């Protein structure tokens, strides 16, 4: 990951508003640099790998949907704002992978134990992606602002 970090920092230092990498198919930490956002892996919303197994250390069935807002400044240049949503892939009745916003799954959970597990997963993925605890965040939000450091 060190070489990916160095590459991301190089690109943001040289004008990129965001660098989005992808390798492990697992959500990895992102960092807000003075020049832009470096997200090293957003997960895997396209594949089936891992959605039928529970692995507390990987949670391969979770992904990040990154929201990147760019606005041209009147004096030149571009301003950026970043936020994200958490998605979870689950198998439907036909055995096909379907991705849902985690917020929707939490709201529709029929059992308290299921809802509590989804909330624990939400806190885990939030911390894995941002490096920060979710404690003071509106956990029912569909879109989380990327925390400022």
Predicted features by range, described:
Residues 1-11, 135-144:
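Short N-terminal signal/transit or membrane-insertion segments
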